[in-house]
Amino acid sequence: LVQIAEYLKEDLLRIYTHIRLEDYRVTQEDIALRAMRNLCLSYLAYTNLGNNVVQKHYNNANNMTDTLAALNMATKAALPCRDTLLADFEQKWQHDGLVMDKWFALQATRPDENVLEIVQALMDHPSFNFNNPNRLRSLVGSFANHNLRAFHHISGSGYRFLTDVLIRLNETNPQV
């Protein structure tokens, strides 16, 4: 991925900068343009331009699609701006449970070696509620389903974690 991104960097940057959407509109054309621009961003994040491009994309976003695209790429590419952007997003959206579900899901898919510890710590976050199925799914479900390297770690720690969560869940809300 890094080699492809570096090889295509100039073309990706040209397309990315050419697509300018001033106002947010829900039209097929604008949706397609946002998708193309965010696809370019997803590759540019893995180049030496990644940190600056992703941070500017986040700061200039005027809609949740672009905001989450930048946050997603900062997280997946483990960019230096990641923690600052995650903290900013949390501060802005901490009182909106559905939006925070996105934040929890992103945290659970981090490529960090210590992601399991991060997920466990987030279970004590003020916006996390173990008895809220959406919150549990966004954090624990994202970890188990979308962070396969960490979940299937050779130590078995991901399996033990999920087992503990399921036992606790069965005691409090067996229908989930």
Segments predicted by a language model, with ranges:
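Long, ordered, helix-rich scaffold segments
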Residues: 1-176
